[in-house]
């Protein structure tokens, strides 16, 4: 337990609960109980990371409520030295800091109240007219007072102004809240506060129990695991339990039906008690009920269609697989037959040889016919050219009629492109073809 007097510990607790957050309150309570703690022990007791613990300690040290000391220590089973940070409270410094802050707080409120009092102005007690501090400068009388410019009555200070009333109310509220702290400071001034440096804090330090330390470690590990789970990347899981989903859907449908039955309007709301006809609310409820029924039926029909399509696809793929299997077996059997046929050699028969010789003879005759036709055509072309090279026939009186007829007959023969030699050649060519 700390060596500080009870009134000092009470003062520190009052200050922490009046002006600080919950985590700062827990931190200072732990230091007051154990007198001195390391950063690791404090983090374990509070169940927070060491980094956050040091951040809290830095804030309290800035306000001069906490003292921090670092030193090198040797841990058990290790030869390397480590820097260890200790937290403790220097009571004299803490009390002085509290006094100074309370003085600054009260002074700030009083200064604001004084400013409001200086600017409160003046008021006429007869006509209740108010004047500011600048307006009354032109209303000075020979006696050195201020007179009203309306009725001439002497002006008085406005003690009931809104600013003055709010300032007095603010100061009274503050003094009521800090009255306990001021009383504690007065009682602390009546006693002698012992010095609490780092050595004395270590001498009066209360060790952390193993049960508390183990419990804090479990809480810290649990909090860290929760943080890791909350900050981990999202994962996707696929659940193939179709039966479970079916049961859940069935339960949801049952719940919907029960809720729909509960939400049905009473009979005296749905139908008129006088005429017995359906009211507007009843018609609306009936339309909504029919819409829900149609929606459920459509969903069921859709599920049935999907099931039938799935069964048809399964049957189609089964037939396709059977057909592919039969085709593969048939191809295997054909490959076996081809391998057996390859074992035998092809034999050339006499008939095939005779057919080949016949084909060769027919090709030879066709070639000869083409050659003879080309010779005949050449002869015709040659005769036409010779005919064109002859000199023109000039008719004279000394030529007889018989000569004229002979020349005309030759001309006709040449023009037609035929002569007796050509006809004989054609007959011979026909004979050769036969």
Curated annotation (Swiss-Prot):
Its main location: nucleus. Keywords: Metal-binding, Nucleus, Transcription, Transcription regulation, Zinc, Zinc-finger. The keyword Zinc applies. The keyword Ion transport does not apply. Residues 419-434 have a biased composition (Acidic residues). It comes from the Eukaryota. Residues 226-238, 386-399 have a biased composition (Polar residues). Recruits TFIIH to the initiation complex and stimulates the RNA polymerase II C-terminal domain kinase and DNA-dependent ATPase activities of TFIIH. Both TFIIH and TFIIE are required for promoter clearance by RNA polymerase. This is Transcription initiation factor IIE subunit alpha. It comes from Schizosaccharomyces pombe (strain 972 / ATCC 24843) (Fission yeast). The lineage of its organism: Eukaryota, Fungi, Dikarya, Ascomycota, Taphrinomycotina.
């Amino acid at each position: 337990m700390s060596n500080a007097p009870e009134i000092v510990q009470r003062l520190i607790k009052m200050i922490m609960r009046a002006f600080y957050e919950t985590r700062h309150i827990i931190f200072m309570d732990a230091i007051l109980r154990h007198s001195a703690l390391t950063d690791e022990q404090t983090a374990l007791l509070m169940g927070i990371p060491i980094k956050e613990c040091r951040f809290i300690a830095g804030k309290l040290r800035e306000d001069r409520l906490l003292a921090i000391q670092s030193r090198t220590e040797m841990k058990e089973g290790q030869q390397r030295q480590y820097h260890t940070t200790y937290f403790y409270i220097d009571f004299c410094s803490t009390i002085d800091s509290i006094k100074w802050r309370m003085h600054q707080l009260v002074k700030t409120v009083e200064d604001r109240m004084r400013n409001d009092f200086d600017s409160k102005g003046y008021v006429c007690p007869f006509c209740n007219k108010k004047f500011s501090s600048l307006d009354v400068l032109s209303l000075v009388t020979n006696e050195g007072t201020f007179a009203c410019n309306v009725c001439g009555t002497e002006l008085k200070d406005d003690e009931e102004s809104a600013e003055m009333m709010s300032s007095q109310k603010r100061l009274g509220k503050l003094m009521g809240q800090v009255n306990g702290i001021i009383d504690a400071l007065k009682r602390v001034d009546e006693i002698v506060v012992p010095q609490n440096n780092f050595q004395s804090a270590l001498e009066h330090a209360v060790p952390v129990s193993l049960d508390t330390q183990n419990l804090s470690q479990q809480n810290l590990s649990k909090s860290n695991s929760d943080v890791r789970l909350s900050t981990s990347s999202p994962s996707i899981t696929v659940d193939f339990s179709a039966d479970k989903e079916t049961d859940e859907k069935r339960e949801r449908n049952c719940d919907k039906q029960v809720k729909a039955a509960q939400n049905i309007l009473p009979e005296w709301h749905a139908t008129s008690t006088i005429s017995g006809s359906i009211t507007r609310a009843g018609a609306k409820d009936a339309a909504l009920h029919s819409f829900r029924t149609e929606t459920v039926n459509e969903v069921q029909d859709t599920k049935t269609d999907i099931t039938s399509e799935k069964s048809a696809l399964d049957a189609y793929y089964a037939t396709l697989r059977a057909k592919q299997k039969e085709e593969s077996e048939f191809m295997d059997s054909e490959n076996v037959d081809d391998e057996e046929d390859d074992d035998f050699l092809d034999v050339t028969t006499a008939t095939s040889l005779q057919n080949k010789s016949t084909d060769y003879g027919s090709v030879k005759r066709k070639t000869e016919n083409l050659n003879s036709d080309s010779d005949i055509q050449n002869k015709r072309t040659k005769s036409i050219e010779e005919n064109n090279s002859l000199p023109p026939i000039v008719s004279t009186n000394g030529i007889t009629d018989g000569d004229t007829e002979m020349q005309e007959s030759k001309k006709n023969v040449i023009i037609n492109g035929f002569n007796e030699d050509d006809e004989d050649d054609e007959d011979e060519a026909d004979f050769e073809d036969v």
